Amino acid sequence: MAIQTSNLGYPRIGLQREWKKTLEAFWSNKIDEEQFLTTMKEIRLQHVKVQQEKGIELIPVGDFTYYDHVLDTAYMLGFIPSRFSEFTSYLDVYFAMARGSKDHVASEMTKWFNTNYHYIVPEYEEGLQISLKDNRPLRLYEEAKKELGVDGKPVILGPYTFLKLAKGYNEEQFATILKELVAPYVQLFSELHAAGAQIIQVDEPIFASLTKDEINQAKELYEAIHKEVPNANLLLQTYFDSVEENYEEIIAFPVSGIGLDFVHGKEGNVNAISKYGFPADKILAIGCIDGRNIWRADLDDVLSLFTTLQNQITAKGLIVQPSCSLLHTPIDKTEETHLTSELFDALAFANQKLEELVLIHSALTKGVESISSDLTTYRNAHHAIRSSAARNREDVKVARTSLKEDDFSRPLPFEKRYELQQVALQLPLLPTTTIGSFPQTSEVRQTRKQWRNGDITNEQYNQFIEKETAKWIRYQEDIGLDVLVHGEFERTDMVEYFGERLAGFSFTKNGWVQSYGSRCVKPPVIYGDVAFISGMTIKETVYAQSLTEKVVKGMLTGPVTILNWSFVRNDISRKEVSYQIALALRHEIELLESSGIRVIQVDEPALREGMPLKEKDWDAYITWAVQSFLLATSSVENETQIHTHMCYSNFEDIVDAIRALDADVISIETSRSHGEFINTLKHTTYEKGIGLGVYDIHSPRVPSKDEMFTIVEQSLQVCDPKYFWINPDCGLKTRRTEEVIPALEHMVQAAKDARSLLKTNA
């Protein structure tokens, strides 16, 4: 049986974030289109070359993008909203869809399944002519072949997942639109096959969570495609979970190979193969290296998996590959020499994961003895990190085992608390606030860099932060906001900032991953037991409050978001790590309260994204996620108002969970999703404080007062004015001052108009 190495996708951003820098230089007109395209080609080919040099046989092509692979697919198929029809060039249309423009609202952006990557949501419109507008995968396949002699593996987002992720149609239209996708996909696969593509990877991650009716519908789709292009070798790729419930149907699809996730879906996929076997005429692509985390693989465990599978199946061939695209991991760990040896030795970034694939391939084809020294190295690394003091703290263990039931609930129910809070805070009807951060200007970033490099003193840096804070407190007062924030000028990132101040975290120098577009994040590494050390936000928040008579919110990131936006140790459950973080935050919240801060926001934007793909697994996750939030926030007095914030999510699935958080006020992204959550609230009630975001902060355009007033008006049809707040969709860190101030002025005026309307109607 032939065994090959393969990769599902490579990080786009470049070892020194060249991709990000090129994008932003183009957007700011520092380079022209020709230079942009030339540089992007160089980066793209370099990524192929790295994989070639690492010994990967099936190298992905077409996974590279200028922004997002879902957006690439939408453009390729002609899913271009009519509001962008005035743009003529490819890049103008493409980036307008992604980012919006002065006069055009961007397409919606949301989380890619349960990851921290965001995709641009395809929009279907009536009368849309679906066709293969642009065979970009073919161009990239031919480019790699011509420039590097690499017969690559084209990577395509599959038609079923693509349409399921799209919006703008009703359920009755789905089957019809699906049939319309057959022709362009047939043309795409046919042209790739004719050009010599030996195997074509078709990503269908949504197959992990389909019903029987849906999987049968998808099978009919692939049968229709196969009928027209029977000779194209399609590898149907699933990831992020098992396909256990639909495995029997999936192995009957008319494709040449099937890729399964044996990391995040190991138990289910192994069970399915044990029960149903695997077709002898198909290739099995085994996702055995974790594409979503940064830890070295347990090679003994992986080789044991292959033994189990090889004893049960007689496939046409095997492919050794990651569990998903390596998009979700940093590129290379070699620069992280500042880390302790026990942590450094435990890590594997994208390039190291490629090396692991080659090691496994060697063991399978040449015998385990061919990697005996590597196995010893790996075993020693695993033992060193497991037995480290950082992973065996007695104080953390005692705190966890001492928890009682009343540690997870507030003393009084919401209605009674809110009455006390209204007396204490003296806020108007429809209070206005922001989500937390204000613009991180080049001056802010440069000053922080100087401080970190030791070029300025702590005192100089603190004076600068206080100056920025005071300036924005004045701005907020002048604008007329009701609840102010200190602006978070001291923070690089809403997770990294807290991780730097808690035990159990470590940080990379170059561990960047793409979040959305050119935005890259450097997730903390939770490698040990998490514990409180000292106050993290007290100084800045108390200083801001001293400057104003108005209420200033304390700003924290919640335990589940810190968990979901970090690379997390894999030797204990995520629930246990989340509880450790919650206990540390509980201490911080108590310190804020005792320092006179009466409104404390604990952001949980990542609560929804951490949900398992399968509905049957939701309850268990939601239970411990909600309990983590309650553990962090429930020790405050009734008069202290707890806020939380969420963004980028499909909220209709978790309305009950949002309610169970028992936050006094929740703010939710609304405008970018075109009022989707407002529609959700038409079918359910939410009887606590809520603010539905009235403008999209991800676009540079300044919305008018009337636009915001319309969203407020729509919101008040489903929300009780008594409990309604007015705020932007998200934090304003990435916007410019000249965009933020007029937008907030319009927002405050919209709030005043809404109050007048309520008064008139009353």
Swiss-Prot record:
Gene3D superfamilies recorded: 3.20.20.210
What's a BP term from Gene Ontology annotated to this protein?
methionine biosynthetic process
The UniProt catalytic activity note for this protein reads:
5-methyltetrahydropteroyltri-L-glutamate + L-homocysteine = tetrahydropteroyltri-L-glutamate + L-methionine
**Chain sites annotated for binding Zn(2+):** H645, C647, E669, C730
Question: According to its UniProt record, which cofactors does this protein need?
Answer: Zn(2+)
Residues holding L-homocysteine: I435, G436, S437, E488, D603
- GO terms assigned for molecular function: 5-methyltetrahydropteroyltriglutamate-homocysteine S-methyltransferase activity; zinc ion binding
What are its E.C. numbers?
A: 2.1.1.14
Pathway info? Amino-acid biosynthesis; L-methionine biosynthesis via de novo pathway; L-methionine from L-homocysteine (MetE route): step 1/1
The answer to whether keyword Disulfide bond applies is: no
Matches recorded under Pfam families: Meth_synt_1, Meth_synt_2
Residues given in the record as 5-methyltetrahydropteroyltri-L-glutamate binding sites: R17, E18, W19, K20, K111, R519, C520, W565, E609
* Taxonomic superkingdom: Bacteria
Is Nucleotide-binding found in the keyword set?
no
| Keywords assigned by UniProt, alphabetized | Amino-acid biosynthesis, Metal-binding, Methionine biosynthesis, Methyltransferase, Repeat, Transferase, Zinc
The active site of this protein is located at H698
Please name the SUPFAM superfamilies in this protein's record: UROD/MetE-like
Tell me where the transmembrane regions lie.
Answer: none
User: Where, in this chain's numbering, is L-methionine bound?
Assistant: I435, G436, S437, E488, D603
* InterPro entries attached to this UniProt entry: Cbl-indep_Met_Synth_N, Cobalamin-indep_Met_synthase, Met_Synth_C/arc, UROD/MetE-like_sf
Q: Quote the record's cofactor note.
A: Binds 1 zinc ion per subunit.
What this chain does, per the entry, is described as: Catalyzes the transfer of a methyl group from 5-methyltetrahydrofolate to homocysteine resulting in methionine formation.
Q: Which family does it belong to?
A: Belongs to the vitamin-B12 independent methionine synthase family.
- Give the protein name, as stated in the record: 5-methyltetrahydropteroyltriglutamate--homocysteine methyltransferase
